[in-house]
Amino acid sequence: TGFENTQPGKRLVGRALTMRFLPPRPDLTEAALTLAKEGNWDRRYYARAAEEANPGDVVVAELGGSDGHNLFGDMGATGIQMRGAAGVIIDGGMRDYTGLRDERFADFPILHKFSDPHTTAWLGVEYNAPVRIGGVTVLPGDIVVGDNGGIFFFPSSLVERVLDYADESAAREKFQLQLLENKEYRFRDIYPLSPELQAEFERLRN
């Protein structure tokens, strides 16, 4: 996926709290400032999340994967973490790479494209609205699962189906590994399971 994890090996699971950023221009910046003042929220969307995120949220920030523009640093991440959020996914950069790998953030993985020491100049234009991450549309409230192996987004309505599939896949892989260790079947019959072994797997599962 091209994302790096500040906490390698730590899996991120939660609900998507989305935000989208664009390069600034004077009229857009003025409009954003007006909306923020009228709504009494911080126009810096990471700061808004540090005030509004709910426990279990995963902040999902679309920055277009652009080099040289980042979302936040240590302070912003700490604010979001203190709200009980599960982590952050940034289709762009972040600051304070060394600090964000500190043990203080051991349970707060940040999946990001790159790190950059400069303060971002990009402007938040949408909050809790559809965003695009790696060519995938993400809606607010979608379930997020991410680690070093990749990032998955799916509608919350599919949670039970996805969990059932994950459980079955894990059980099948365990069954296949046991068959390999027993050395009683050919590899081609184990991976994928032959009809005979598939039937045996289903019998054991039930």
Predicted regions, residues:
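N-terminal low-complexity or amphipathic/hydrophobic leaders
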Residues: 1-39
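General beta-strand structural signal in soluble alpha/beta enzymes
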Residues: 1, 21, 60-62, 70, ...
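Short alpha-helix capping/helix-loop boundary micro-motifs
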Residues: 3-4, 43-47, 130-132
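Extracellular/luminal Protease-associated
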Residues: 48-92
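A hydrophobic, small-residue-rich beta->alpha segment in the mid-to-C-terminal subdomain
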Residues: 143-182
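A contiguous pocket-lining binding segment that forms or flanks enzyme active sites
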Residues: 90-91, 96-146
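Acidic/histidine-enriched, glycine/proline-rich intrinsically disordered or flexible terminal extensions
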Residues: 183-206
